[in-house]
Every structure is written in structure tokens, then in C-alpha cells.
Amino acid sequence: MPKKFQGENSKSATARARKAEAKAVADARKQKELEDALWEDNDKRVVKKEQRKDDKERKRLEALERKRENQRLLEEEDSKIKGKQTKEGPSKVTRAQIEETLQSKQNVKEIKEKEKSHLDVPLEENVNRIVPEEGTVEARTIEDAIAVLSTKEDLDRHPERRMKAAYTAFEEANMPRVKMENPNMRLSQLKQQLKKEWTKSPENPLNQRAASYNTK
């Protein structure tokens, strides 16, 4: 039986070995590509997930920053309003206090004037009920006062001693007229007006004395 050719078998084995090696390399390359693709896909998912997480955190921080900024602006505006009110407050209070003080002073002044006018020359006092002092002559009217002053030589030298009775009669006689002429005047102002008229009135004993002196 003839022998087989050994060299041919060696070449065939080498070819098969090379083929197997090439296949193994190709399979390894393919496997690597598959693994790389898998890792790449996983990386993309991770990156997207991280990006979404980062975006969410960024939006949260931005919202928090806007909230803080709005709070700061609100506090700043509130502080300005309070500061403005603090500056205006004392001024209003001061004006109110000044007006109240002036009104109080005016009221006190009017009360004092009324008390003084009533004490000096009581308008409501009825001279007909005044009890004459000892050593004096009672005069119920202006004519009586003038008659007393004119008939008493010693008293005529000092007519000011009978001024009060004469003025009281003058005031009672002329107060209604002055009130009618000056309806808006207070009692103290009416009395001042009468006093001015009294200084020039011929019914004033002092004026009568001066007139009598001038005729001599």
C-alpha cells in the first residue's frame, strides 16, 4: 500500500491553523466591538442621566437664588417704607402737639379774660342791690352819680372814687348797643370796646371835671 504525502498534510494543517487563528481574531474583534458598543451605550445613558440630574439641581439652585433675591428686594423695600414713615412720623406728631398746645393756651387765655372781666366789672351784677359802704352815697343811675359828684364839693375833687359806680351804670346802659353792633365779639372784647368809649364819654366824671375846669 503506497504511503501518503506528508508535506501536503503539513500545509493543510497550517492553513487550517491560520484560518482558525484568523477566525479567532475576527471573533475577538467582533466581541470587542460588541462590548465597546455596549459600554458606549451605557456611557450615553449614564451621561444623559447625569445631565438630567445636573439640570434638575441647576434649576433648583436657580429657583432658590430667585427666591432669595425676591426676599432681599422685599426686605429692602420694606426698610425704605419704614424709614420714610419714621422720618414723617415725628413731624406730624409735632404739628399735632403744637396745634394742641396753642389751642390749650388759647382756651386758658379766654378763661382768664372772662374771669378777669367778671372780677373787675361784673356785668350781671345788679347795682340796685349793692349795699352802700359806710360814708358813701348810693347812686343807682348815671344821673344820680353825676348829681352826687356835682353836689359834693369835697368829693368832686376826687371823682375817681366814684368811677366804678358811674362806669357800671354806663356799661349796663350801653352793652346791648355794643353787642348789637358787634355780634361776633366775645364778652372781653365788648368790655374793651366800652372802656374805650368810656374814656371819651361825657358821662365820665373825669371828663366832666376837665370840662368844668376848662370853662372856668
UniProtKB/Swiss-Prot annotation:
Example GO biological process: transcription by RNA polymerase II
One Pfam family per UniProt: Ccdc124
GO molecular function: transcription coactivator activity
Residue segments, region Disordered: 1-93, 194-216
Annotated signal peptide: none
Keywords noted in UniProt: Coiled coil, Cytoplasm, Cytoskeleton
GO cellular component, one term: midbody
Protein name: Coiled-coil domain-containing protein 124
Name of the gene this protein is made from: ccdc124
